[in-house]
Structures are given as C-alpha cells and as structure tokens.
C-alpha cells in the first residue's frame, strides 16, 4: 500500500470517528445559568426561584431546589424526562398540592415545610418507586388524603407526616412501610384495623397527639410483630397501652402523659425491651414484679413522678439493690411522706418504709417498760412481743404511770456566725437515726421566704451554710427522718433563729488580711505626724536662713545691683532653689537684670530686677505646662521660665 493510500485511509477513519462523536456533543446539555452542576448534582437552592429552570442535564441524579418560592405551576413537564434523578429536595417552597411532573424513578422526595393540603392517588402513581417521602410541616388533613392514595407505592419504607392536621391514621398504607412518623398532629383515636397490615413496621412515633386509653383499640399494636420502637410521648394516657407486641419491641417511650397507674401485666412478655421511659407522669407506686419479664432491661427512666415511699414500694428498694451494674435506673426519688422526701428509694433502710406488722387480737405491744431502759443506752428498735395464751395481758395504763417516758429534746441545735455569708451549725441527737432534714430560710417568719433544704446522714453532727445574705436573719430547722422509732413519730421540726455577721465586722474574702493591714497604721499615726511637722520646720528654717544671709550680704532686701549669672550658682542660690521647684516665683520689675541663657546662645541684652514673692501658708504657686493659666509665661519641667518665651 502506497503512502498516499495510507494517509487517505487514516484521514477517512478520523472523519468517521468525528461524525460518531458529534451526536454526543449535541446531546450534552449545559448547566442552567442560575444553577451549579457537579457530576450529577444540580444545585439550584436558595435563589428565590419561582419555577424549576429548564435545561437540566440528562445525567442529573440529585436536584437541590430547597429554600425557593417554587409553586405547583413552576414544575415544568420536561422534568419527567430526567430518568436518572433519584433524589429531589423541594422543602421550604410554595407548593399547595402534591407536585406532579416529577421524574418517575425518584426514590427520595423532600416536601416538608410547604403548604400542601391534598394528596391524590394519581400524583403518587407517577412516582411508583418512591422509598422515602417527607411531608412534615404541611397542612395535610385526614379528609385531604384520598382513600388508598399510597396503596400502589409498594416500595415505600419511610413516611413522615409530622406536624400536620391529621385526626386519624391514613387508610391503605402499604405493608412495606418500616418507619411511620405522625407526631404533633390531632390524632385522638386509632382503630384496630388502622395498623393491622403494617407487619414490617419497625418504628412508630405518635408523640404530641390527643390519644387516651379509650382512643386506642385493645389490640391496635398486636399485629406489629416487627415493631422495635414505640413512642407515645405527650399524650393523655392514664396507664400504659395494653397488648404491646412482645417479640421485637426494644424501646418504649411513655413520658409526659397522665399515667397514675401501671397494671401488673403491662410489660409482660416484653423480653427484648431494653429502654423504658415513664418520666413526667403522676405515678406514686409500682406493682410488685412489674419488671420481672424485662430480662434485657438496661435503661429505666422514671424521673419527675410523685413517688410515695410507703410499704408498697419496699420491694422496689430490694429489686434495685439486686440489679447488676449494667442496669441504669434514674428518677426513683421519694416525694412523700414528708420524713423521706428527697431521698432515693435505693438508699432507704427497711424501717423508713413504715411497714407495720398486721397484728391480730392475740398480739399486744409490751414495749414501754422494756424499751425505756434499753433504747437510750443501746439504740435498739422497738419490737412487738407476742402474747402467750397462758399470760395475762399487762395493764398498759399502770405501766405508763410507773415508768413514764422521759421528756427530752431529740435534737439540740447550736449555731455560730462565722462570716457575713456563712453560719456554722452543730447539733446533738439523743437517739440514733438514719438521716435528718436540714432547712434554712431568710427571715424569721416560717411563712414568707423561700426555703432551702438538704438531707444529712445520721452520722454527721455539723454543717456549714454558705452564700448567705450579710446582716440578715435566718431561721434554721431540723427534723428527723425516721419511722421505725416510736420516739420519733412526731415530725415537728426543731428550729433556731440567728443572723449573719454585719459587714463592718467582716470582709467575706480578706478579713484576716485587712485586720493585719490595720495594725501598722494604728501604731504609726504619731510618728507620721512628727515626720511631717519636722519637715515643715526644716524648710521654714532653711528659708529664713537664706533671707538673713541675703540681707547680711547686700545690706538690703531689695537691691538694684544684684546680678543673675551662671558663675555664682551655689546650693543656697535662688537659681538653685528654682531648679528644685521652690514655692517662690520670680517677678520681673525692671529691665536692669542681665539674662544669661543656659545654651550659651546670644540673647538681646535686657536688664531685669528679680523680686522673690513667698506665698502665704506654704501654698505652691508652681504651675506646669499642662495647667490652665492666664499667664503668657511657659515653664520647663524644672520650673524655670523658658527663655525662648520670656517677656518683659
């Protein structure tokens, strides 16, 4: 083959290859000018668009259209041709109906925070492969959803309808749904058939609705065999719902309801449950054995319930003490009776539960004589003595008269004000006890003012109150927290009144240092005055000596022949005194005094007479360059007039 033939063949092949590539170039669409495109991701969000721009590339997979003003009319029909689009974000727009003209292969659609009111079967039929549908924060009501609108969306797994206007659960939901969120709606009733087909449902959220026990069907949750999480927070339930699914349920949220009673079998067969929350209800007691079937329970939250720690709750303490360390229980704190308020149930000993024995007619209490001698010395608890058939019951009245109970204060309190903000409290107890409640209140009145209280253990005998108001009265009270001791049945508090120290006596932070600082000044007031007086006298004597020396030398206090030159400077010269910022000033009287500049520059010869004026009472007439003065004379730092600014 010749060279020319070969070159012709190569050129022809290149031409055919170019023709083959031309259709591809024509089919590739550029990115819309208002958007940004990046490998299938089309970003048209936050641009105040009222419609979806045309010309979106065919290879687009995800459309970001949120935070615009797109309405239903702004969705073009050519959007249906984008077969590769699987995710569309259209939240925070102006849609009032479920949009149409969407790509048929979309799997994830975000429509939350619009104003969508109606959902039709035809609109959902256009997206048959939808898996996640987010319709939160719209205006969807039960009547605005067409019956069976979702029935052919057989791939739908997540349906979010939170914060809408639903009064019932939509009918005809597909069996494929795994997560259903209906929180913050107006649902008041759920019939047994509403959820019976949702056998694949794993998470059901019904928070913030109007549900009560009568509005829930008796078997409404029984068919949810794969349900792992059920949330009924912020409803109006008075007890846990019946017939909960026990095969898979792992999380149960019942907080913020009106529950005041828990039936004994409420949690039967919930063997997989590991988290249970019944906080913020009105529960006062729990039936014994309520948690026996919860083999996997590791998190139990019972906060903010008015627990009454009576005899019926003693089993809870025993159960808590037998739990392994992996089980986390929170919120079992006594609110009543008053003697144990603020104490955790787990820390109570058995005597505090007030479980008095139910003694029949053949049992009497013979404790007065025996325990009066034993209890104060040995600290033993009163015990009932059972009557024997052959023993005649003793005369109780006679026993009280022969061995009266000694009247003695059970608690003796002593207080001492330490600083303006602290009070030291100490006390003595006549009988052994487990705990005491200490309270303090600003003011003497037990009615007005907020009360602060704390629980102190029985082995303590002192306490320090801090962060108090200075110079303020306080009422401090203590009351024993016992029930098993017959001498402590009276819960009347023992109170004492005191005041914090005044501010003039104490400094809350540096009191000791301040007192140490005051001592030197108390002893140094006299020497300091003597030093000042001596200095004043010395200055006065020096000035007087200078005047006498001047008069003695010149024969007169005012001389016209006195020369002010640099060669005559001595320590007692007025020029030297001027450099020491003497309190005298120089007044120019006549032009007969020669001025000699310090920098030896020639000046115009002028003669001056300098007269020294002493201000009365030692008042300084010296003015620096920063003080206000009407004089036209400026001063250097040494106090001598600046020769460049002197005037006659």
UniProtKB/Swiss-Prot annotation:
Stretches assigned to the Fibronectin type-III domain: 409-503
Glycosylated sites: 226
Side Extracellular, residues: 29-527
Disulfide partners: 31-37, 35-44, 309-334
Residues of the LRRNT domain: 30-62
Membrane topology listed for this record: Single-pass membrane protein
Gene Ontology terms: biological process: cell-cell adhesion via plasma-membrane adhesion molecules; embryonic morphogenesis; fibroblast growth factor receptor signaling pathway; head development; heart development; neuron projection development; neuron projection extension; proepicardium cell migration involved in pericardium morphogenesis
One GO molecular-function entry: identical protein binding
LRR repeats: 58-82, 83-105, 107-126, 127-152, 153-179, 181-197, 198-223, 225-246, 247-269, 270-293
Cytoplasmic face residues: 549-648
Keywords: Cell adhesion, Cell junction, Cell membrane, Cell projection, Developmental protein, Disulfide bond, Endoplasmic reticulum, Glycoprotein, Leucine-rich repeat, Membrane, Repeat, Secreted, Signal, Transmembrane, Transmembrane helix
A GO-annotated cellular component: plasma membrane
Biased composition (Low complexity): 624-633
Signal peptide start-end: 1-28
Compartments where located: Cell membrane; Endoplasmic reticulum membrane; Cell junction, Focal adhesion; Secreted
Post-translational modification: N-glycosylated. Proteolytic cleavage in the juxtamembrane region gives rise to a soluble ectodomain. Cleavage is probably effected by a metalloprotease.
Region of interest (Disordered), residue spans: 624-648
Segments passing through the bilayer: 528-548
Domain LRRCT: 305-356
Role of this protein: Functions in cell-cell adhesion, cell migration and axon guidance, exerting an attractive or repulsive role depending on its interaction partners. Modulates cadherin-dependent cell-cell adhesion and cell sorting. Plays a role in the spatial organization of brain neurons. Plays a role in vascular development. Plays a role in cell-cell adhesion via its interaction with latrophilins that are expressed at the surface of adjacent cells. Mediates axon attraction towards cells expressing ntn1.
Subunit details: Interacts with fgfr1 and fgfr4. Interacts with rnd1, cdh1 and pcdh8. Interacts (via extracellular domain) with unc5b and unc5d (via extracellular domain).
Protein name (database record): Leucine-rich repeat transmembrane protein FLRT3
């Amino acid at each position: 083959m010749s060279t020319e033939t070969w070159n012709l063949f190569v050129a022809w092949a290149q031409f055919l290859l170019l023709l083959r590539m031309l259709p591809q170039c024509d089919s590739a669409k550029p990115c819309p000018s208002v958007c940004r495109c990046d490998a299938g991701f089309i970003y048209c969000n936050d641009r105040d668009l009222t419609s979806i721009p045309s010309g979106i590339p065919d290879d687009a997979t995800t459309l970001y259209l949120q935070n615009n003003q797109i309405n239903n009319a702004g969705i073009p029909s050519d959007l249906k041709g984008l077969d590769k689009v699987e995710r569309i974000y259209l939240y925070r727009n102006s849609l009032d109906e479920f949009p149409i003209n969407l790509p048929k292969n979309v799997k994830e659609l975000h429509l939350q925070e619009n104003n969508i009111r109606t959902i039709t079967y035809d609109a959902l039929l256009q997206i048959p492969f939808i898996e996640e549908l987010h319709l939160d924060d719209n205006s969807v009501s039960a009547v605005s959803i067409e019956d069976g609108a979702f029935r052919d969306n057989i791939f739908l797994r997540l349906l979010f309808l939170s914060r809408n206007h639903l009064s019932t659960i939509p009918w005809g939901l597909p069996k494929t749904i795994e997560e259903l969120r209906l929180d913050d709606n107006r649902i008041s009733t759920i019939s047994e058939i509403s959820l019976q087909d949702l056998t694949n449902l794993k998470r059901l959220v019904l928070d913030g609705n109007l549900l009560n026990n009568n509005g829930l069907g008796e078997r409404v949750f029984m068919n949810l065999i794969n349900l792992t999480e059920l949330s009924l927070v912020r409803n109006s339930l008075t007890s846990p719902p019946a017939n909960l699914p026990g095969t898979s349920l792992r999380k149960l949220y019942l907080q913020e309801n009106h529950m005041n009673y828990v039936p004994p079998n409420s949690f039967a067969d919930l063997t997989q449950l590991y988290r249970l929350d019944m906080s913020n209800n009105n529960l006062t007691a729990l039936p014994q054995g309520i948690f026996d079937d919860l083999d996997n329970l590791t998190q139990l939250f019972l906060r903010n319930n008015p627990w009454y720690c009576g005899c019926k709750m003693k089993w809870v303490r025993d159960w808590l003490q037998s739990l392994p360390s992996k089980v986390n229980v929170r919120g079992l704190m006594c609110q009543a009776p008053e003697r144990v308020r603020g104490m955790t149930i787990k820390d109570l000993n058995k005597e505090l539960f007030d479980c008095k024995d139910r003694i029949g007619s053949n049992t009497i209490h013979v404790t007065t004589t025996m325990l009066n001698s034993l209890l104060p010395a040995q600290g033993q608890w009163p015990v009932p003595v059972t009557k024997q058939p052959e023993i005649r019951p003793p005369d109780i009245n006679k026993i009280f008269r022969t061995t009266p109970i000694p009247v003695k204060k059970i608690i003796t309190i002593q207080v001492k004000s330490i600083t303006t903000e602290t009070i030291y409290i100490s006390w003595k107890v006549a009988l052994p006890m487990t705990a005491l409640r200490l309270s303090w209140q600003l003011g003497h009145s037990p009615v007005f003012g907020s009360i602060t209280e704390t629980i102190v253990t029985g082995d303590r005998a002192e306490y320090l109150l801090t962060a108090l108001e200075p110079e303020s009265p306080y009422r401090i009270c203590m009351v024993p927290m016992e029930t098993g001791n017959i001498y402590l049945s009276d819960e009347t508090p023992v109170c004492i009144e005191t005041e914090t120290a005044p501010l003039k006596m104490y400094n809350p932070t540096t009191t000791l240092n301040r007192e140490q600082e005051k001592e030197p000044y108390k002893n140094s007031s006299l020497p300091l005055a003597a030093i000042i007086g001596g200095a004043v006298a010395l200055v006065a004597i020096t000035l007087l000596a200078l005047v006498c020396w001047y008069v003695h030398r010149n024969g007169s206090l005012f001389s016209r022949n006195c020369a002010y030159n640099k060669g005559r400077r001595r320590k007692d010269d007025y020029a030297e005194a001027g450099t020491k910022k003497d309190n005298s000033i120089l007044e120019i009287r006549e032009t007969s005094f020669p001025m000699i500049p310090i920098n030896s520059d020639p000046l115009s010869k002028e003669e001056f007479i300098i007269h020294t004026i002493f201000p009365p009472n030692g008042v300084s007439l010296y003015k620096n360059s920063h003080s206000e003065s009407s004089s036209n004379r400026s001063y250097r730092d040494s106090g001598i007039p600046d020769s460049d600014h002197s005037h006659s």
